[in-house]
Amino acid sequence: MVNYPNGKKAVVHSAQKTESSNRPREKVSAGGRGMELEKEINITNKYYLTNDIAVIHKKPTPVTIVHVDYPKRSAAKITEAYFKLPSTTDYNGIYRGKYIDFEAKDNMINTSFPLKSIHPHQIDHLDAVLRHGGIAFVIVRFVMRKETFFVPAKRITDFYRTADRSSIPYDWFCLNGTLIPSSYTRPVDYLKIVDRLYFKE
């Protein structure tokens, strides 16, 4: 069984039980929606790695194991654990000698992107990456529009800290972001945008 930071427990033997009332509805739906974007980014990253283009991986979600059962000598079963809040962002790695760090978010709302989808510690982390010369950005997918935007981190963090509103309008992404191209082998080919913005010939 998995315990969340608030001390509540959720049984994880099946997807149906995971999405129980012990877990806030918004968090469950957001996690489910994010899996498709995450899957596509992972496929893209595998292509980059296989073709020696870049080394970029998803960061593991921190978990504290509380109890382990050993039903067999050769098997161990985790029966209780805590999900920790992620401390930074989703992905990081190296591309063309530069450190790459980014967050990826799915969004089901057509007209805007809720700022609560990005946590304050993630904003601080993105700012820190920029201060130390890394390339940081946010990938936001408007699911219903089937559009995926690349947004440089500074534009997101500036909006987060200065705008007097709780969401970022869709039109803002059209002006401040770049649509990410897609192909069969690279469903979210974000390095094409990195090349265009950060490695101008």
Regions found by a protein language model. Give the residues of each.
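Charged phosphate-binding loop/patch that engages nucleotide di/tri-phosphates or the phosphate backbone
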Residues: 2-24, 28, 174-201
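Acidic-basic catalytic patches of nuclease active cores, encompassing PD-(D/E)XK
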Residues: 21-78
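Positively charged, polar, low-complexity stretches
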Residues: 53, 68, 82-93, 162, ...
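Short, solvent-exposed loop/turn segments at secondary-structure junctions
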Residues: 65-66, 109-112, 146
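Conserved catalytic cores of phosphodiester-cleaving nucleases, focusing on short active-site segments
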Residues: 89-110
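Mg2+/Mn2+-dependent nuclease catalytic core
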Residues: 105-132
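Nucleic-acid nuclease catalytic cores
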Residues: 127-157
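Short, electropositive alpha-helical surface patch
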Residues: 151-173
